[in-house]
Swiss-Prot record:
The keyword Nucleus does not apply. It is found in: Cytoplasm. HAMAP family: MatP (MF_01073). Transmembrane segments: none annotated. It holds the Pfam family MatP. The lineage of its organism: Bacteria, Pseudomonadati, Pseudomonadota, Gammaproteobacteria, Pasteurellales. It comes from Pasteurella multocida (strain Pm70). This is Macrodomain Ter protein. The gene is matP. Required for spatial organization of the terminus region of the chromosome (Ter macrodomain) during the cell cycle. Prevents early segregation of duplicated Ter macrodomains during cell division. Binds specifically to matS, which is a 13 bp signature motif repeated within the Ter macrodomain. One of its GO terms (cellular component) is cytoplasm.
Length: 148
């Protein structure tokens, strides 16, 4: 396993996920009867700061169709949590106008690169062009001095 499991943290994430699903109107329990389902959700709500109780509630009452979704959500959250710790793996975002993004995307596909690689390539090319222009202007100035 690439990422360390933090039991207390993950129990809190599971609690947040399940409460969010409940508030969106989804039945998070395995019970069809509304009153029984509501009782179990109230029980879960009262267990917010009890990681072991949350895990026990999930084992006993979670809807089977939510089990896989919950595991996937926690796995993704764990990855984002650990990747967010290091500057090198933390996701960054930039604002691009749609037309700019479209051009960059087409250019990336043409170059068979990712968007990040394409941006780095374009910056490197621009820097080398500026360095080349500086060398040419220095040579021109040197030639003018020689011809005087």
């Amino acid at each position: 396993m690439k990422y360390q499991k933090l039991e207390n943290q993950e129990a809190h994430w599971k609690w947040l996920y399940l409460i969010k699903k409940h508030r969106e109107g989804e039945n998070i329990t395995r019970y069809e009867e509304r009153s029984l389902s509501e009782d179990k959700v109230k029980q879960l709500l009262s267990q917010q700061n009890q990681p072991q109780a949350i895990e026990n509630w999930i084992k006993a009452h979670l809807s089977p169709h939510l089990m896989i979704k919950l595991d996937q959500a926690i796995r993704a959250r764990r990855k984002r949590f650990f990747n967010g710790e290091k500057q090198s793996t933390k996701k960054k975002s930039i604002d691009l106008e749609y037309a700019v993004w479209l051009r960059l995307s087409r250019y990336s596909r043409k170059m068979k690169m990712t968007l990040s690689e394409t941006i780095t390539y374009m910056i490197d090319e621009r820097e080398s062009k500026a360095q080349y222009e500086h060398q040419i202007s220095a040579m021109k100035a040197g030639l003018k001095d020689l011809l005087k």
